[in-house]
Amino acid sequence: MLSCKLLAKCLLWASLQNQVPADALLAIMEVEGGRAGLEVSNANGTHDLGLMQINTCWLPDLARAWSIPSSQVRRLIRDNDCLNITVAAHILKTKIREAQGDILQGIARYNNAHPHYGRPYLGKVIRAYFKQSRRAFSRLHGVREKRK
């Protein structure tokens, strides 16, 4: 597990490399709730891997692009937070492109290829984004957040 500072550097680097909003990646990270080494089974037989919960459907393309076996890609993505974030940023960039540059639709498609089914996920990411913004504003201005 990376330190917060190193995680932030990875996130910013991945954001810049893939030209996707860092705050969107951060909100997705919060919603996904993953961590290094985590592998979650899905009903359709795929698995979600690591910090950003990268779906194993991406493994064949990544294995081809990196010229290494899918099993090795799986371990790397599952266990390396920085690489996991970088792959997530690449996926988000791909999904935004598929949505003709619409960031919100790209975020919805990050979770589900069908935009309609991605809407609930998009709502979660937007809520996470605003929650993070409130926390940052509160810290910046020395305001205490109300506890619910």
PLM region spans:
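Catalytic glycan-binding domains that act on GlcNAc-containing polysaccharides
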Residues: 1-148
